[in-house]
Amino acid sequence: MDSNTVSSFQVDCFLWHVRKRFADQELGDAPFLDRLRRDQKSLRGRGSTLGLDIGTATRAGKQIVERILEEESDEALKMTIASVPASRYLTDMTLEEMSRDWFMLMPKQTVAGSLCIRMDQAIMDKNIILKANFSVTFDRLETLILLRAFTEEGAIVGEISPLPSLPGHTDEDVKNAIGGLIGGLEWNDNTVRVSETLQRFAWRSSNEDGRPPLPPKQKRKMARTIESEV
């Protein structure tokens, strides 16, 4: 196993522990708590994949961070902070919408890269809107936290989420996953729209009513990708 993979996991575990202590003092805002919950799932998946205990990794990560801080000068820290581009966290969904459990009558699931696409193929003839929470850097989607498909009644009928065991994805990965979800939903004569935030940063190809146009051939291709169950 690559040593950098192990040490990266150890540092991530310790930093998550620090953030959790911060949240326990009721100091975190909604985006902070949302990322904390998502990162916890990611760490569990990575720990399982690597065969590493999170508690042991957290203690090792603490030693690594302490060693770095001992060697870090205030001036070097200022220069590092100044060179890192600031990311923005954008939210279409409330914390309740993100954390709500949902169920599928005809569940379909597929994996697209490091993203998992889930949808209920029992849904027909509905008006559906896609909402997402994600971070943006340089006006481009950086990290998708969660995307969900809602009916006009507020029911959740689809979802795109990062796989905890496969961290890392590009804005193009997200766009392809959105296309797959849309194609699967439209196959059952649903009308799908994308939120303004998603149009701007993740989809970038929609008509005037916010409904991304997909040619019939592409729709059929996208729908077929949804058909494969995991």
Swiss-Prot record:
Inhibits post-transcriptional processing of cellular pre-mRNA, by binding and inhibiting two cellular proteins that are required for the 3'-end processing of cellular pre-mRNAs: the 30 kDa cleavage and polyadenylation specificity factor/CPSF4 and the poly(A)-binding protein 2/PABPN1. In turn, unprocessed 3' end pre-mRNAs accumulate in the host nucleus and are no longer exported to the cytoplasm. Cellular protein synthesis is thereby shut off very early after virus infection. Residues 204-230 are annotated as: Disordered. Belongs to the influenza A viruses NS1 family. The keyword Ubl conjugation applies. Upon interferon induction, ISGylated via host HERC5; this results in the impairment of NS1 interaction with RNA targets due to its inability to form homodimers and to interact with host EIF2AK2/PKR. This is Non-structural protein 1. Residues 180-215 are annotated as: CPSF4-binding. Residues 223-230 are annotated as: PABPN1-binding. SUPFAM superfamilies: Ns1 effector domain-like, S15/NS1 RNA-binding domain. Residues 1-73 are annotated as: RNA-binding and homodimerization. One of its GO terms (biological process) is symbiont-mediated suppression of host mRNA processing. The dsRNA-binding region is required for suppression of RNA silencing. Homodimer. Interacts with host TRIM25 (via coiled coil); this interaction specifically inhibits TRIM25 multimerization and TRIM25-mediated RIGI CARD ubiquitination. Interacts with human EIF2AK2/PKR, CPSF4, IVNS1ABP and PABPN1. A motif (Nuclear export signal) lies at residues 137-146. Keywords: Eukaryotic host gene expression shutoff by virus, Host cytoplasm, Host gene expression shutoff by virus, Host mRNA suppression by virus, Host nucleus, Host-virus interaction, Inhibition of host innate immune response by virus, Inhibition of host interferon signaling pathway by virus, Inhibition of host PKR by virus, Inhibition of host pre-mRNA processing by virus, Inhibition of host RIG-I by virus, Inhibition of host RLR pathway by virus, Interferon antiviral system evasion, RNA-binding, Ubl conjugation, Viral immunoevasion. A motif (Nuclear localization signal) lies at residues 34-38. The keyword Magnesium does not apply. It comes from Influenza A virus (strain A/Turkey/Ontario/7732/1966 H5N9). It is found in: Host nucleus; Host cytoplasm. One of its GO terms (molecular function) is protein serine/threonine kinase inhibitor activity. One of its GO terms (cellular component) is host cell cytoplasm.
